[in-house]
């Protein structure tokens, strides 16, 4: 009697529940696309009905999917809920998909989180991949190049980027010295992000950018509200019910995007009031020059109200990626002082202390460049590209891939693939140097994946590389970074669209020589 009272369901109810469960499972299985004769579907590990592999991914999808690839190969399929997701690993396979078959894999999945970014009109996240998208991407690329890496004949600097970074790096050094004279330590991320956002802000908006405003600082110091939800594999994109349940992370994501969009719209509007098409001095001016009023545009013109979508991608990616790269670099340097000393010896030998580093010094500083490459590889702080999708039925490595299939590209796996890298878990910049140590091993450097490949490759890749190089060269020429004895620095990546390290508020900076 006691046993029967402890059972909450009758045998009939349990049988009915099991039948419904099996019915749903087989219905979902029947929805899978038919595979043409002679082809096969990618291998798929066992997953839970209804849930798929979401429990397997957990907090570190890049690690879980890397382990799966070791067993199932470079092309495999998982399910998040009932949605099939193609997972690509291996440099050759990824290059085949994104470069050689780039038109097949250039799409973006229509994810819920993407609809919340600039009202679903983001150039980077939008599922659109047609001629209009291509034209706007080309326009954004040209505007970015013109006012960043192109030469400025009226300046003593080689380009706009060099001018802005040089000035902001000096300002950062001054701020760090003030902090050392006060509390005696600092959180590098909070300091670096201010300088980096001022650089991209100056290039985008010129004198109209509100440097160090409370609104701007509040946004850029809280990017975690964006990256934790925009990351690949977020359940909210695959389980619609989660959008209607209490979800603090999703609410923060929505609020951040709304605040960021308001900030950009206000700044764009203020800039437009003073726009002179005969005197274009920043990225916004270049975009205005190729815009027209009204909801529709033709040829190379775009509607003015769409400009904010382009500048959102340029501005947003321009500060978060570079800030994260520099912050990771400083964390490696304080935990590996011998590497820091090698970089500074190279700077002292090749540049000296009588002038500041410039972008033209890059060929003379191979060890610094190798260190940056190893930081990109080892941290892999962009573990996945933004998800891709197929634009048509296709095949890859003999497997059938249907149209509109969501695709995860595992950059972390490539950067830690033992078939590509000797001792991939070790941080070793020398791996990127030629035998005599005087130059970068170019074929090996091209195996590092951080900015994607093919038609969706990041348009700011060159800018980001140059900016990280110049910031670090100027900082390390003048400062020595360290942490006090006994302070533990946690280098465990925190998963997100861009993976951050745990915040460290105990970093110190000492002047290496008197600044003239």
Swiss-Prot record:
Name listed for the protein in its UniProt record: Cytochrome P450 1A2
Record-linked CDD domains: CYP1A
Underlying gene: CYP1A2
Gene3D superfamilies reported for this sequence: Cytochrome P450 (1.10.630.10)
UniProt topology in membrane: Peripheral membrane protein
Pathway participation: Cofactor metabolism; retinol metabolism; Steroid metabolism; cholesterol metabolism; Lipid metabolism; arachidonate metabolism
Family to which the UniProt record says this protein belongs: Belongs to the cytochrome P450 family.
Subunit field text: Interacts with PGRMC1; the interaction requires PGRMC1 homodimerization.
UniProt cofactor(s): heme
